[in-house]
């Protein structure tokens, strides 16, 4: 799988997980409709399915996915919650993405 497809799949996976957790949060903490649990559960099902599409060892996928997840949550904080990321949020996200790139794309012996 190409690097661009891998990162895109990680981003889509992260969005599914974030939405799957955020929708029940809205119900529990902000008094929104209980019906949000249905798309929340579907999002978590999609998250698990998307995570299974990555073509490398599960442990490596989970470790690398964490870097993309961090960056996607910071983006969610800004776009959905309306909270502008700090310089340190952005630096931390960049470091996490660098870690993801090293884990996923470093040369490996066959």
UniProtKB/Swiss-Prot annotation:
Location relative to the cell: Cell inner membrane
InterPro entries: UPF0060
GO cellular component: plasma membrane
Main location: membrane
Domain of life: Bacteria
Topology term for the membrane: Multi-pass membrane protein
TM stretches of this protein: 7-27, 33-53, 63-83, 87-107
Keywords attached to this entry: Cell inner membrane, Cell membrane, Membrane, Transmembrane, Transmembrane helix
Coiled-coil portions: none
Annotated family: Belongs to the UPF0060 family.
Protein name: UPF0060 membrane protein Pcryo_1498
